[in-house]
Amino acid sequence: MPTLLTRKLEQTLPPIKSGDNVARVKYFTPWSTWTWYAAEASAELEDGSEVPLSDPRARDRVDVMFWGVVFGHEKEYGYWRLSDLAEIRGPMGLMIERDLYFHSTPLDQCQDPTARHR
């Protein structure tokens, strides 16, 4: 299974609170319609501080915090951690996946995965 966050993807994600509104990574649950579009990300350090993923201190991170839009029960902008995504398990042990074919998309154009079924 592909990794949820590669070094190459890390280089494309601006730090949290940079004001960027372009999703660069898409995560989804293969057993439901939950979908996360990440526009910004920062490394969380052991002392609780956050630094850009491009910062050399990010190598010693304890987690990665994302900001973007989530389509779950409803559309919601907010924050989530990489570790939270990695811990989620669905039926038969299914895990969150990264859309390998996703291209950067403005957040306001990201699609609700259930919209076409309404």
Kindly label every feature range from the protein language model.
Residues 39-91:
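Acidic, aromatic-enriched beta-alpha/helix-loop junctions
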Residues 2, 14-15, 30, 52, ...:
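Proline-rich intrinsically disordered, low-complexity coils
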